[in-house]
């Protein structure tokens, strides 16, 4: 055959593995299966779907890496800044809430900074990984609904959430969220390698 190894994505469909994907599958031996990387050559229906595809991918990588960590590592910090992996998960869900619902759509949000306490990320002792993953998935669905109901050029609603900068276009908000996820999932790659030798892409 000419297609080489095949990687199976989380919902059961498969795709031929490029050399880069084959390598990634080997080095991520400890990770749970996550969505395939949204390669630039893959056709999409719109520019908005490009952003949504990257956000879906980074969320899936985040969750698979967290689920692959030994349980004690979720609330352990391995870096001088002091954050823990489970705190990172809660932070990213709230980041989407802040940017897309509170700022862009101008919705009233009871606690837009709900992951923050005394200037640092916080997860209560009773909050579990399963609950926070479910919250992330629920937020992802709401985020997609916001994006699909607007054009990328639409401007956010005026409000206090923007500080002094003023509202931004949806496209700029999505670009910010993609870089935020990419940066933090890269941070989690480092923490995972320190915790159990799991090597990221």
Predicted ranges, named:
Residues 119-157, 171-178:
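Acidic/histidine-rich alpha-helical segments that form the ligand environment
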Residues 3, 9, 17, 24-25:
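Ala/Thr-enriched low-complexity intrinsically disordered regions
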